[in-house]
């Protein structure tokens, strides 16, 4: 009986041991009794960690109310890789000043041509019989606008666009395909673009017999099915303010061979301000300025399929801190400058002046990176031009009127100072101007170098060679300019302006860009 009892105890103990942890067992020794300690009550389970909040955007409940009589239309939602958004379609025309507020879950849509105000005519005082509607369309920082096909934004004379973003929240104009995540680094031409019209002087008038630069000299926006006129005699005219703005995938063909640029200005005046504007993958020009007065700082043009910067019809423009980078194998010129099409001595004569540019030619067209013609006056100072393909000549000048030294509203030959070229071929014969003549004009400037070896990094950031070039003081050209410490667009002490508000692509990468160009940024 004793033997049976011990057997039962041992068997029961083995089962208990199997259910206990090491710290719950007291060793029985070799001959003593076995003691089993009951485990302590388990600690309460911790509170569950909240499920992480998704970074994907969810749509706003509806569209905001605006001051315009015709309201935004709630057109449901649109989805893409960054989430789902409420689609708020703009009216075809803003007839009252209105604000498009930022909302993380809203995208504003243009369905066809969207007009800001009605055309107030070329005269600001009503002497032309037209009445200003004085509409100001304001977009808050972070607003994103998309469109498709022939849709474009038309800011008419006597009205304004106030699109002022911030470094962290730029204002973005883009395409439907971009929203839906369908684009790649070669996509382009998916909607029209942004057009600002003003009353500053232009040439090449559409009215026969009109005097260039006068209140009677007007021009029509290329490709617009309905009248979209610009021009007048008010150099200080104001068409709005643009800052921290991206314009992506523009250039849809409106009619025939007429395409819009990312940004088109027609007769805008000095009252219009531009700072930190980026054009990305326009199927036509990156920006084009038709007449007027344009003052712009910190312009970026990436991937334009025609000209990066096109200037025409008597514009007088000052640009400082400019980056233009072509996609490999794509694009025409970095700069195309004309004055008045076939009227080379019309006035006002174009005078465009650029300081602190970095131009990267990549098209391999074997044409030219910069073409100056049509009797225009032009100045490039404190700048760098590099041909990555080794096939495109740097500089071409056309027409005897472009290098003349006397004439109405004439500043003489093109001016180059502290301008360095890194091309396999520096100069090309033009129409009426030989490569040798162009070289002579270039060599007459100060601190120019046509045999430069670039040391750029990140595609456009100065290296030792660029920082070693003596600087030309551009305030001698215009009080608009500031006197820089170095040539080029990005250099020590001037290398943060590209941060935050830009977008990245295989063509050009910027520090702390707000997103890839193929994606929308997601804001908190």
Residue positions per predicted region:
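C-terminal motif of bacterial Sec signal peptides marking the signal peptidase cleavage site
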Residues: 16-19
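Active-site-surrounding "flap" and adjacent substrate/cofactor-binding loops of secreted or lumenal enzymes
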Residues: 157-170
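Ser/Thr-rich, Proline-interspersed low-complexity disordered segments
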Residues: 39-55
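Long, low-complexity, serine/threonine/proline-rich intrinsically disordered regulatory regions
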Residues: 4-5, 33, 42
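Short, conserved catalytic or interaction motifs in soluble domains
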Residues: 22
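Left-handed beta-helix
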Residues: 140-141
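Extracellular beta-rich repeat passengers
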Residues: 25-33, 50-134, 150-158, 174-284, ...
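Bacterial N-terminal signal peptides that target proteins for export
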Residues: 1-9
């Amino acid at each position: 009986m004793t033997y049976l009892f011990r057997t039962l105890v041992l068997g029961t103990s083995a089962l208990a041991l199997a259910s206990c942890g090491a710290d719950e067992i007291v060793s029985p020794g070799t001959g003593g009794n076995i003691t089993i300690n009951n485990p302590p009550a388990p600690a309460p389970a911790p509170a569950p960690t909240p499920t992480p909040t998704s970074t994907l955007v969810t749509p706003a409940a509806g569209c905001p109310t605006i001051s315009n009589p015709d309201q935004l239309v709630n057109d449901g939602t649109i989805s893409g890789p960054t989430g789902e958004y409420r689609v708020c379609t703009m009216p075809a025309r803003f007839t009252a000043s209105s604000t498009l507020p930022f909302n993380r879950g809203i995208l504003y849509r243009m369905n066809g041509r969207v007009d800001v105000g009605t055309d107030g005519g070329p005269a600001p005082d009503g002497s032309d019989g037209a009445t200003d509607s004085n509409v100001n369309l304001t977009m808050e920082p972070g607003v994103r606008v998309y469109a498709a096909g022939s849709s474009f934004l038309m800011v008419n004379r006597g009205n304004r666009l106030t699109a002022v973003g911030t470094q962290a929240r730029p204002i973005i104009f883009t395409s439907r395909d971009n929203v839906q995540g369908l684009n790649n680094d070669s996509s382009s031409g998916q909607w029209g673009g942004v057009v600002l019209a003003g009353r500053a002087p232009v040439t090449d008038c559409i009215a026969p017999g009109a005097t260039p630069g006068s209140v009677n000299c007007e021009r029509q926006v290329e490709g617009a099915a309905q009248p979209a006129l610009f021009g007048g005699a008010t150099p200080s005219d104001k068409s709005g303010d643009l800052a921290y703005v991206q314009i992506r995938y523009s250039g849809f063909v409106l009619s025939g061979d007429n395409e819009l640029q990312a940004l088109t200005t027609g007769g805008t005046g000095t009252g219009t301000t531009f700072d930190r504007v980026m054009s990305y993958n326009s199927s036509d020009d990156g920006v084009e300025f038709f007449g007027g007065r344009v003052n712009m700082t910190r312009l970026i043009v990436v991937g334009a399929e025609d000209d990066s910067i096109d200037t025409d019809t008597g514009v007088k423009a000052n640009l400082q801190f400019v980056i233009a980078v072509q996609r490999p194998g794509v694009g025409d010129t970095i700069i195309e400058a004309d004055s008045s099409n076939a009227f080379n001595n019309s006035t006002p004569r174009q005078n465009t002046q650029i300081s602190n540019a970095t131009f990267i030619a990549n098209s391999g067209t074997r044409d030219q990176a910069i073409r100056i013609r049509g009797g225009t006056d032009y100045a490039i100072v404190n700048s760098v031009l590099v041909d990555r393909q080794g096939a495109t000549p740097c500089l071409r000048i056309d027409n005897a009127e472009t290098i003349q030294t006397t004439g109405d509203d004439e500043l003489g030959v093109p001016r180059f100072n502290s301008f360095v070229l890194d091309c396999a071929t520096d100069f090309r014969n033009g129409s009426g101007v030989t490569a040798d003549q162009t070289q002579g004009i270039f060599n007459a400037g100060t601190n120019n170098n046509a045999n430069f070896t670039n040391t750029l990094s990140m595609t456009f950031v100065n290296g030792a060679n660029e920082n070693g070039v003596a600087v030309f003081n551009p305030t001698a050209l215009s009080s608009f300019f500031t006197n820089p410490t170095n040539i080029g667009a990005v250099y020590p002490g001037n290398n943060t302006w590209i941060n935050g508000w830009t977008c990245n692509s295989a063509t050009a990468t910027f520090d702390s860009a707000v997103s890839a160009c193929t994606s929308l940024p997601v804001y908190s």
